[in-house]
């Protein structure tokens, strides 16, 4: 089969108190029993086309460990059915491409692994995650979580760390832009009480199995249908499901 590198996104999990997000969205009506837990989806793109956006927002949720290799730390998010946790969380990520990690087929994978291992090191090498208040990150100050009212919910615990040291400068610049811009659009998104936990690297695959545009079969391997997130054709549950439907329809149409 043929492989090709593809753009993906990296960043952090940001957490706010759910009550703050509800107030930012609903104003005086926040807390009304008829209203659902507040959700958000925010994005911005600079003049060069690089994007920063929120992804997989989890109202009343928790930040969970998602590592798949030793000596790495990876964050993800989830909500339970009741969505009644104290915090809201979402991935806050920046798009990256070959200009960031190189043009080799597996250069994106290597970049991803470096970030995940560096997060492991910053977290104290015991699978805690590095975390920092949004306020100290934006002010380039010492990472002090004690001043933030939001308690990080990462399942393995956190360790205060300077998240600037985790990312290259272009990614830090976009994260800073996103925090400031999104806080203007949704008051409380990036206030002094919000916290960030790293590292978020699994929004989509950094590599793609090349498939024929008409048959959807892998180039050089008849009968193999690359599909969904792992194959590089989706970035989330819904888009993976849609891609699966497309593949199924193609197979049905052949027989």
Please provide the spans of the model-predicted regions:
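Residues forming the flavin
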Residues: 1-255
